[in-house]
Amino acid sequence: MKAVVFAYHDMGCTGIQALLDAGYDIAAIFTHPDNPGENHFFGSVARLAAEQGIPVWAPEDVNHPLWIERIREMKPDVLFSFYYRNLLGDEILNLAPKGAFNLHGSLLPKYRGRAPLNWVLVNGESETGVTLHRMVNRADAGDIVAQQAVAIGADDAALTLHRKLCAAATELLSRALPAILAGTTDERPQDHSQATYVGRRTPEDGRLDWELPAQTLHNLVRAVSDPWPGAFGYAGANKFIVWKSRVRHDLPAAKPGTVLSIAPLIVACQDGALEIVTGQTERGVYMQGAQLAQALGLVSGAVISSKPVVAIKRRTRVLILGVNGFIGNHLTERLLQDDNYEIYGLDIGSDAISRFLDCPRFHFVEGDISIHSEWIEYHIKKCDVVLPLVAIATPIEYTRNPLRVFELDFEENLKIIRDCVKYNKRIIFPSTSEVYGMCTDKNFDEDSSNLVVGPINKQRWIYSVSKQLLDRVIWAYGDKNGLKFTLFRPFNWMGPRLDNLNAARIGSSRAITQLILNLVEGSPIKLIEGGKQKRCFTDISDGIEALFRIIENKDGRCDGQIINIGNPDNEASIKELAEMLLACFERHPLRDRFPPFAGFREVESSDYYGKGYQDVEHRKPSIRNAKRCLNWEPKVEMEETVEHTLDFFLRTVELVDDKNP
């Protein structure tokens, strides 16, 4: 009978060997690549397959149509799963006419799910076992083919029980596999009303809570002892691991966590006490309990905890490249309002951040990211969070200097991304609403909207595509290399210090700054294609608060996320923005210092931006991810933002005029 096998771990090796011994023809084996973060004490399915001359694969998604088709071509009679970590879809299960069978490490229907071996010890069970059952589209719910019970001894820990289960699996399979081969199995349905479910365990689940009974903690120690990560506690700020313990009821009661003795090392619990027979400090070696007490500096009467009691707080170091820019200087101001952050910044100028230069938590170097690569790499290594905010982000430059846009926005930022991967640093990358391009969705969604750009001869898309490709590179590094990242997409942020009027004079600024320059100089406001394009304008204070919460990253909710940051309620056309700005200008107290309004003038985009430009009719964000990950919503109405922005620039002009009469 031809079999295709899905297997991992010692149980995988046990199952494969049993199939070979029973005379099955194994056409292929599917397994998992070893995780470098795991302690690989178990046998290698891949190595066993290679030694037996059996083809072996470890696909990321075995349920992908390409792999389904490959398995179909193998024409298996039967499928077996031995501790394979992923569920097999119906399309695979239906490929084998004799059915699909799974080996599970408990006496089903009890302990369906992940890590039953550890859970039975945690719960103090006296019996467990292994079950061979038919696979259905619900995990561990199919008819039972055979079971083998295993007694759990009082001295059993995770490894000894694991070995017992492997031996039981060998015995069970020696009976069941020939029956499957002969078609003589005696199967029975599970009683689903008796089913219990357990979930995946993590190292954090090994935390010792001294408020619990000593027997409960002893069971936990047994369940996660070596080669699993171990049960742990804290003496002050020092973490220690308990590998072996015993319950003591012969000492007087005391406050939970109190050290009752150091030789042997005994700690009071809610009910009884726990003797730590062997353990180790976090970076130490395996040792007896009395030596562990000495290494931790414990004395009788000391109190230990489940969490670090004394933790030296270090500020989060944030590296901001482009710190003098619009987002950079406002973000610096917000971070310095919180004592938890220390900022390292680099930019080619310092006019916008001069107000922070005397702050001891702000460290600034004037420089160019294309020149100061060694400084940047050193500070990426030194800091905790990296925000590469340097980019050319003004539309006229996309057609005027497309290669410079590519060199700075893509090539220089790619170096920074790779350094973050190299030093395992979290990157918060400024994507852009431009990546959505000419998307036709009513609201642009980070996870489902298509990213639509124009033809190659429309060079204005070089910015959008450069940013999109970096988004994809970062995503791939996160998926394949474990890079911690968040991508944020600003939607038309406005406020004080957005560009400057000198940049607007040469056309290298965002829309509102250009419009303010027209009012200040008394020149006509140019409306590209009539100013019908709609945007959603976001106050810089709202945007920065969202970005601050991304940096905070409470409970890791922003890891691996793409987050639009915009105000969908502040949607307006460029013409409506200009009219609102004009109304604010006319009632401003400094209005009489400036020339009369010169009117609106409609111009074609090719006349203003040059050939290669293509505009976008609307750009409205979905902020579902921002609400979910950040508990954030924008608050500032558009007119208030326009007033503040205009006031800042008009008073800047006033200061210049006062100095230069």
From Swiss-Prot:
Record CDD domains: Arna_FMT_C (cd08702), Arna_like_SDR_e (cd05257), FMT_core_ArnA_N (cd08644)
EC number: 2.1.2.13, 1.1.1.305
Keyword annotations from UniProtKB, A to Z: Antibiotic resistance, Lipid A biosynthesis, Lipid biosynthesis, Lipid metabolism, Lipopolysaccharide biosynthesis, Multifunctional enzyme, NAD, Oxidoreductase, Transferase
Organism name: Klebsiella pneumoniae subsp. pneumoniae (strain ATCC 700721 / MGH 78578)
Described function: Bifunctional enzyme that catalyzes the oxidative decarboxylation of UDP-glucuronic acid (UDP-GlcUA) to UDP-4-keto-arabinose (UDP-Ara4O) and the addition of a formyl group to UDP-4-amino-4-deoxy-L-arabinose (UDP-L-Ara4N) to form UDP-L-4-formamido-arabinose (UDP-L-Ara4FN). The modified arabinose is attached to lipid A and is required for resistance to polymyxin and cationic antimicrobial peptides.
GO biological process: lipid A biosynthetic process; lipopolysaccharide biosynthetic process; response to antibiotic
Subunit structure: Homohexamer, formed by a dimer of trimers.
Record-annotated site: Transition state stabilizer: 102
Ranges where the record places region Formyltransferase ArnAFT: 1-304
Spans annotated as Dehydrogenase ArnADH: 314-661
Catalytic activity: UDP-alpha-D-glucuronate + NAD(+) = UDP-beta-L-threo-pentopyranos-4-ulose + CO2 + NADH; UDP-4-amino-4-deoxy-beta-L-arabinose + (6R)-10-formyltetrahydrofolate = UDP-4-deoxy-4-formamido-beta-L-arabinose + (6S)-5,6,7,8-tetrahydrofolate + H(+)
This protein's name: Bifunctional polymyxin resistance protein ArnA
Residues that hold (6R)-10-formyltetrahydrofolate according to the record: 114, 136-140
Binding sites annotated in the UniProt record for UDP-alpha-D-glucuronate: 393, 398, 432-433, 460, 492, 526-535, 613
Active site, per annotation: 104 (proton donor), 434 (proton acceptor), 619 (proton donor)
Site (Raises pKa of active site His): 140
Family: In the N-terminal section; belongs to the Fmt family. UDP-L-Ara4N formyltransferase subfamily. In the C-terminal section; belongs to the NAD(P)-dependent epimerase/dehydratase family. UDP-glucuronic acid decarboxylase subfamily.
Listed pathway(s): Nucleotide-sugar biosynthesis; UDP-4-deoxy-4-formamido-beta-L-arabinose biosynthesis; UDP-4-deoxy-4-formamido-beta-L-arabinose from UDP-alpha-D-glucuronate: step 1/3; Nucleotide-sugar biosynthesis; UDP-4-deoxy-4-formamido-beta-L-arabinose biosynthesis; UDP-4-deoxy-4-formamido-beta-L-arabinose from UDP-alpha-D-glucuronate: step 3/3; Bacterial outer membrane biogenesis; lipopolysaccharide biosynthesis
GO molecular function terms attached to this record: carboxy-lyase activity; UDP-4-amino-4-deoxy-L-arabinose formyltransferase activity; UDP-glucuronate dehydrogenase activity
Binding site for NAD(+): 347, 368-369
InterPro entries named in the record: Arna-like_SDR_e (IPR045869), Bifun_polymyxin_resist_ArnA (IPR021168), Epimerase_deHydtase (IPR001509), Formyl_trans_C (IPR005793), Formyl_transf_N (IPR002376), Formyl_transf_N_sf (IPR036477), Formyl_transferase-like_C_sf (IPR011034), Lipid_A_modif_metabolic_enz (IPR050177)
